[in-house]
């Protein structure tokens, strides 16, 4: 996968050189480049200006963004604008982006964008109902969530399949050594070696956690008969 990021602050992306994203680069599975679009700005390197019609703040000008993207060698990229008014980013969205060969991210600052910039983009993405100082943190989040889904990036292909949201449910509780820590013990079922009992326990705990913390996810979840019965059992036990 090739990723190009348009930003005024390339140095903010240093953390991406480490961990999973860094390993993807080392394996030759990811090629990532940062472009300071101030370098392409005309008018004394100014990238922002006052909005026509008046109003608060400054807007990102179209010219630096257009010129930066036009010099990027890309065949058919997904061009992503980070915007609080965009489509909410989800695990399913990350899975979709992980199938692409080329992604371009536009990280804004200031009050907003000249609307004409949006004629370039294929996706407008938001991390949620809040506003950040710039798009860099959002871009890093999306890149991390997406790159880890590229085949061969993680040690095992199944490593991400049990993640929260990958199945549509929150992930079940997990434990490691020691068995007893300060009086808190590992559930006996996980020590039993009985694979079917462990599977059922994990499924029930995933359903319980999702029901208690994110019931909205269950509204669009496609239940199996087994899952429906387990959820009914959970609801009855909780009263």
UniProtKB/Swiss-Prot annotation:
It catalyses: guanosine(37) in tRNA + S-adenosyl-L-methionine = N(1)-methylguanosine(37) in tRNA + S-adenosyl-L-homocysteine + H(+). It is found in: Cytoplasm. Belongs to the RNA methyltransferase TrmD family. InterPro entries: Alpha/beta_knot_MTases (IPR029028), tRNA_m1G_MeTrfase_C_sf (IPR023148), tRNA_m1G_MeTrfase_TrmD (IPR002649), tRNA_m1G_MTases_N (IPR029026), tRNA_MeTrfase_TRMD/TRM10 (IPR016009). Pfam families: tRNA_m1G_MT. This is tRNA (guanine-N(1)-)-methyltransferase. Its main location: cytoplasm. PANTHER family: TRNA (GUANINE-N(1)-)-METHYLTRANSFERASE. Specifically methylates guanosine-37 in various tRNAs. Homodimer. GO terms for biological process: tRNA N1-guanine methylation. The keyword Transmembrane helix does not apply. It is an enzyme of class 2 (transferase). The keyword S-adenosyl-L-methionine applies. S-adenosyl-L-methionine binds at residues 108, 127-132. Its EC number is 2.1.1.228. GO terms for cellular component: cytosol. One of its GO terms (molecular function) is tRNA (guanine(37)-N1)-methyltransferase activity. The gene is trmD. Keywords: Cytoplasm, Methyltransferase, S-adenosyl-L-methionine, Transferase, tRNA processing.
